[in-house]
Amino acid sequence: MARTVHCALLKKDADGLDFAPYPGELGQRIFDNVSKEAWAQWLKHQTMLVNENRLNLADARARQYLARQMENYFFGAGAEQPAGYVPPTPT
């Protein structure tokens, strides 16, 4: 049976993650408070941040930046958008 969490991002009850997706306290907080649906949305946003900002994930500063963005995305004011980002218009 799937775990249910009250998702901090989506503000509704939804299926929880199967395991902590990130190490440490932040990973546990995400596991306890973020749904699978919200995590999938973060992965898309994270991919955009990596690509648009040309982040090298071998660089510790890039990983720290992504960790800060992840915490802000789920529990803060929201993650940054890349410079010049224009959201797609619904069709």
UniProtKB/Swiss-Prot annotation:
Entry keyword Iron: yes
Transmembrane segments: none
Keywords, alphabetical: Iron
Xref: Pfam families: Iron_traffic
A GO-annotated cellular component: cytosol
One GO MF term attached to the UniProt entry: iron ion binding
A GO BP annotation: cellular response to oxidative stress
Keyword tRNA processing: no
Function: Could be a mediator in iron transactions between iron acquisition and iron-requiring processes, such as synthesis and/or repair of Fe-S clusters in biosynthetic enzymes.
Family listed: Belongs to the Fe(2+)-trafficking protein family.
Full protein name: Probable Fe(2+)-trafficking protein
Species of provenance: Methylibium petroleiphilum (strain ATCC BAA-1232 / LMG 22953 / PM1)
